C-alpha cells in the first residue's frame, strides 16, 4: 500500500499572497528542485511557481497512491491562508483515497475552538502546524492548550520543522528539539515531523 502523508490543497491567488509567490519564484530561480507534477518547477511564469496544488493537479499527482493525507495550510503570517472547509469539501468528494487534516494557526486566540470545529464539524482527522510559516515558538506555554486539545481529540499532528524559502519565516522555530516540552506535556499526542 502506498500512502502519501503530506500533500497540500492551495493555489494562487485564492490562498497565497503575492509576496509568497515572489518567494516561491525566487526559490525556483535558485535551482530548488520541485516536483513538476504539482509545483510547475519548469515554468518561467512566477505565478505558476506559487506551489499551486489545485484539486485537478493533486488528483493527477497522487494517482498512484492508495491513500493520501491532504491539508490546506493556515499561515497568514507568511501569506498562505486556506479555508479548512475547502479541504473538507474536497475530501468528501474523494473519500475512497483522501484523508483530510486541518491546519490551525496557534497564534489565533480561538485556535482551540477552530480545532474542535475542524475535527467535530468538518470531519478533518489530523492537525498540521508549521512554526516557521506561522511564526510561533513551540516552547511558549500559551500554545500548549491547542496540543492538549489535539491529544484529547486523539488526532495526530504533523509538524513542518525545517527550513523554508519564505524570508520572514523564523528558522529558530524550526528546530525539532523545540517540540520536547509539548511531547512531555502531551504524552499521548502522536507527532510526526516533516
Predicted feature residues:
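Helix-coil boundary/capping segments in enzymes
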Residues: 1-194
Amino acid at each position: 500500500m502506498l500512502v502519501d502523508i503530506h500533500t497540500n490543497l492551495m493555489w494562487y491567488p485564492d490562498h497565497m499572497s503575492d509576496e509568497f509567490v515572489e518567494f516561491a519564484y525566487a526559490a525556483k530561480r535558485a535551482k530548488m528542485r520541485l516536483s513538476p507534477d504539482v509545483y510547475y518547477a519548469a515554468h518561467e511564469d512566477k505565478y505558476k511557481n506559487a506551489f499551486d496544488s489545485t484539486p485537478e493537479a493533486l488528483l493527477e499527482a497522487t494517482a498512484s497512491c492508495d491513500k493520501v493525507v491532504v491539508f490546506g495550510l493556515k499561515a497568514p503570517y507568511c501569506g498562505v491562508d486556506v479555508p479548512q472547509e475547502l479541504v473538507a469539501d474536497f475530501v468528501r468528494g474523494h473519500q475512497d483515497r483522501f484523508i483530510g487534516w486541518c491546519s490551525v494557526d496557534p497564534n489565533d486566540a480561538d485556535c482551540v475552538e477552530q480545532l474542535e470545529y475542524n475535527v467535530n464539524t468538518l470531519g478533518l482527522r489530523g492537525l498540521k502546524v508549521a512554526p516557521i510559516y506561522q511564526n510561533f515558538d513551540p516552547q511558549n506555554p500559551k500554545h500548549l492548550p491547542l496540543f492538549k486539545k489535539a491529544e484529547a481529540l486523539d488526532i495526530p499532528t504533523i509538524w513542518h520543522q525545517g527550513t523554508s524559502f519564505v524570508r520572514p519565516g523564523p528558522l529558530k522555530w524550526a528546530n525539532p528539539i523545540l517540540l520536547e516540552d509539548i511531547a512531555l506535556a502531551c504524552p499521548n499526542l502522536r507527532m510526526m515531523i516533516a
